Structures are given as structure tokens and as C-alpha cells.
Amino acid sequence: MARIAGVDVPREKRIVISLTYIYGIGKQTAKEVLAEAGVSEDTRTRDLTEEELGKIREILDRIKVEGDLRREVNLNIKRLIEIGSYRGMRHRRGLPVRGQNTKNNARTRKGPSKTVAGKKK
């Protein structure tokens, strides 16, 4: 496995797919990085030369990925919680943040359902 931005990317896959294993790099960003580095998208990771890998690493060093990006996202969420915004309150309570309806769904965010005892007759 080639190591790029602190992540072991798969050797057998095409480089454009391998780069998406890095947190913060999607398909579009991977294509832009490869275009700037002058590497074909169809090249397998194992077929890259050290020079090409060096170019890709150099370009990715300028982009916020992995630990730096995760830290920034967590700090943004902490900031929302500290200032007491509506979004911060939703984060704190573990509810959907972006206005989704929670009457019936939102099980992923709310966790498994807790059964409430029904009213006795």
C-alpha cells in the first residue's frame, strides 16, 4: 500500500479511487489533484513512480485533509454548542441539525428507540 497524507491507499485500485480513501478527498477533488500533478486517472496506484507520488503528496499538503480537517469540523461543532445556537443545541441533544422532521424517523441520529410505558386502563 502506498502511503499518502498518512493513509494507506489500496495498491490495486485506480489512483482516482484510491485517493478517495483519504478523509476530505472525494472523486472530484481527486480528479483535480491528478490533473494538476499530470497523472492519468486510469493509472493503478502500484504503477505510480516515486516522482508522481511526490507530486501528489505535495499537492495534498496544500489541502486540508485527515486530522486537520477532522479537528476543524469538531471545533466548528464545539463553537456552535458554546455560543448556544439552535444548531449547537441540536448537536448537544443528538438530534438532526438540518431541519429534518423527527416525529417518525431520524433513528440514526436519535439511536435505538426507548419504549415508554403506555397508559393503563
Curated annotation (Swiss-Prot):
Region Disordered: start-end pairs: 91-121
One BP annotation, GO: translation
Keywords: Ribonucleoprotein, Ribosomal protein, RNA-binding, rRNA-binding, tRNA-binding
SUPFAM superfamilies hit by this protein: S13-like H2TH domain (SSF46946)
Amino acid composition bias (Basic residues), ranges on this chain: 106-121
Pfam family, one: Ribosomal_S13
Family designation: Belongs to the universal ribosomal protein uS13 family.
Subunit (UniProt): Part of the 30S ribosomal subunit. Forms a loose heterodimer with protein S19. Forms two bridges to the 50S subunit in the 70S ribosome.
Role, per record: Located at the top of the head of the 30S subunit, it contacts several helices of the 16S rRNA. In the 70S ribosome it contacts the 23S rRNA (bridge B1a) and protein L5 of the 50S subunit (bridge B1b), connecting the 2 subunits; these bridges are implicated in subunit movement. Contacts the tRNAs in the A and P-sites.
Name of the protein this chain belongs to: Small ribosomal subunit protein uS13
